[in-house]
Amino acid sequence: MQSVSDATRYYFLPLTPPMPDLPPTSASPTPWTRKHLLGLQDLSAGELTTILNEAERYKTKWNAGETKFDDLRGTAVANLFFEPSTRTKTSFSLAAKRLSADTIDFTASSSSLSKGETFIDTALNIQAMGIHQMVVRHSSSGAPEQLAREVDCCVINAGDGTHEHPTQGLLDIFTIRSHRPSLQGLTVALVGDIKHSRVARSNIWGLTKLGARVIVCGPPTLMPVGIEEFGVEVAHRLDDVLEQCDCINLLRVQFERQRGAYFPSVREYAHLYGMNGTRMKHAKPDVLILAPGPINRGVEITPDVADGQNSVILDQVTNGLFIRMACLSLLNGARSVQTQQEQSR
């Protein structure tokens, strides 16, 4: 069995770059048949659009006053979080409950992991209690994929190491789509710690497949080698690309994943890459300011920008609920179809 600590294949290199015919000029919805959601790298533009459209369906009903749905009634969802989380864990838990599923929230610190039980054995024991879907966050890149090979239930990646965070990427894209008629031709800047950011990876896969122009911006020390091969442009000075951007997604510096100093000081980083009122004056008047959170006020973003009229940060949190409802619903539908097919054989 592959060790989840073997994370080498989950960095930008040596992953296989997208095929030359990407990104597409348009994307029609594609019927959803996948049992797991492990990342955006392997999804087609049509599959991405299917998730976004399903999220839009829930959002429309929600805004019309419908806040409870029966789509997952009779099923059980387990949130297995082996890393701390506020927004993602709460959002998935609430999404499952809004769909009428039974939910359990697993906490690693109070589990049998402290007694030597393995990650896989823990998951298999939880599945044996009648779980239909598992939402997994883990510090090791590739852990959800390994789990998906061992369990019969659906697996959703809620963030694994520096690999991917697919639902965060989806909700970022959904938020942009909610404010713009199309992603095609939009210029989106991902600013900050690209090297350690699973959010950056999922955003790059999703945005480029849907036709956006993506600029990654940050210190050279926080930029993965060879990232240009993935259809993005690289900038090391935010001021050089600021006026071109339709959307700016400010990524948190991942101090907990860093070994050593990647820039002189936090103050220096904020001076070069932080979004502040002065920079807003040079940006497009309708630029969208995003941040996956948690935000560090005064580092990647100043309070006046975070709370300003261009900020859609809280919209991202709200939209995360609809994206996760969509993912849970679509995977459950695919699981039901596969179960029926197996029973009919």
Name each model feature, range by range.
Residues 72-77, 184-186, 286:
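Phosphate-coordination loops involved in phosphoryl transfer and adenosine-cofactor binding
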Residues 82-94, 178-251:
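Glycine-rich phosphate/diphosphate-binding loop of Rossmann-like nucleotide-binding domains
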Residues 99, 130, 150-152, 210, ...:
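Short, structured coil segments at secondary-structure junctions
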Residues 286-345:
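Adenosine-phosphate binding glycine-rich loop
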Residues 20-90, 94:
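Positively charged, low-complexity intrinsically disordered leader regions
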Residues 66-177, 297:
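Phosphate/diphosphate ligand-binding glycine-rich loop within oxidoreductases
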Residues 227-304:
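Rossmann-like adenosine-cofactor binding region
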